[in-house]
Amino acid sequence: GGDPKAEAAHRDRWMAISAPFVREADGTLTAEEVVRVEQRARGLMFLEDPGRLITSEYDRDRRWTRTLLHEVGSDGEPLVLEDRSSQDRYADPGALAMVAGPYGRMVVREHGGGAFRTGRGSSPKGDLPFLSQQDLGTGETKVLWRCEPGAYETVVALPWARGFFGAFVTRRESKTAPPNYVIRRPGLSGFDAVTDFPDPQPSLRGIKKQRVTYERADGVPLSATLYLPADHQPGERLPLLVWGYPREYNDASTAGQVSGSTDRFTRLSGTSHLFLVTQGYAVMDGATMPIIGDAETMNDTFIAQLVASAKAAIDAAAELGVADPDRVGVAGHSYGEIGRAH
C-alpha cells in the first residue's frame, strides 16, 4: 500500500516484536501486526494502559492528517481524535501533552479520563495559545485556559505527578514585557510570577508593530506584521522590506488564515532583517505568499502567484501611507529567496 498512485484500503501497519526477541533458524524475528492505518503512518504514542495506543496518519495528496485512539486487539473502530487538513491552523486541536511513564518511557498525559492538549490557537485575531482536555471516551474537547488578547502566553509545563492537576506553568510576554514564567491555576484569572527577567533591549520598545490584512488580485486574503521605526510620523513614506516565505496550499480558505501574534515581545539578534527598522525602514514581516493548487500542477502558476502576493503586500503598505513604492525590496530565508529572484 505504499504506492500513492495505487488504491489501497490500508497503506501502513504497525508491527511489534515480543520479548525475548529470539531469532528463527533463518535469522529473522517474528513480528505481529498491532494496528493498521488507512494512510501513511506518521506517528505512534503510548498511554499508560498498554492496551491502548494513539496513531497518526497523513494523506499526502489531500494534505490531510488524522489521529486515532486504538484499543489493541479490539475489532471495534478506533476513536477519531483529530481529522482535518494539515494546513487548517484554525482547526488544529494542539499537541498531546506527554509525561514520563512508570518505566521511563514517554506516554500521553492523562487525567480524569482525558488527555491534555496545548496549541497555538490560531484565529482571525492571531494566535491565542490554549490548554485543553480531550475526553478519551468520546473525543469531545473542553478548553481549560486560553491566552487573552494583549499578551502572548504559552503552556510550557504541566504537573508531572500522575493523578494531579492543580496548576500549570506558562511563558508570558507582551509588546512591552519580556518573556517570563508564571504559574496559573485552572478557573482562576490571576497568576503567580516565577521569574522577573528585565528587558534586554529597552531602546527597541518604541518600535511600532501592527497586523495588516489585505487581498491578492485573485481575492485570496493575505496578512503580514508591519514594523515601523519609533520616530515614524503619520504620512511619512519609508523604504520598505517585504519578508516572506512561499507555502503550498490545496485551497484558498486555509491559505488565507492568519497566524502569529502582534503581542509578542520584539527582540533582535544575529542577522535579523528586523534590524532595518532601527535604520529607518518599514518592514512587512511574515508576509503570506500562498501557492494554491493541487500537488501535480501548482508549480505551473508558482511564479505568477508569488509575484501577485509580493505586489499585494507592497500595494497594502503604500495605501497605508507608510511605504514608498519606488523603494522596495523583497526577501526571505531559504525558499523565501525565490521571491527576491522574481
Task: List each language-model region with its residue ranges.
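Long, heptad-repeat coiled-coil alpha-helices that serve as cytosolic signaling/dimerization stalks
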Residues: 126-130, 329-331
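C-terminal/domain-terminus segments
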Residues: 7-23, 136-137, 293-308
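Serine-hydrolase catalytic core recognition
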Residues: 156-340
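Non-catalytic extracellular/periplasmic "stalk"
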Residues: 139-149
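A cross-family structural signal marking well-folded subdomains
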Residues: 119-120, 131
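Conserved beta-propeller blade repeats
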Residues: 1-17, 29-119, 147-171, 200-213, ...
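Beta-propeller blade signature
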Residues: 11-28, 67-74, 130-139, 183-186
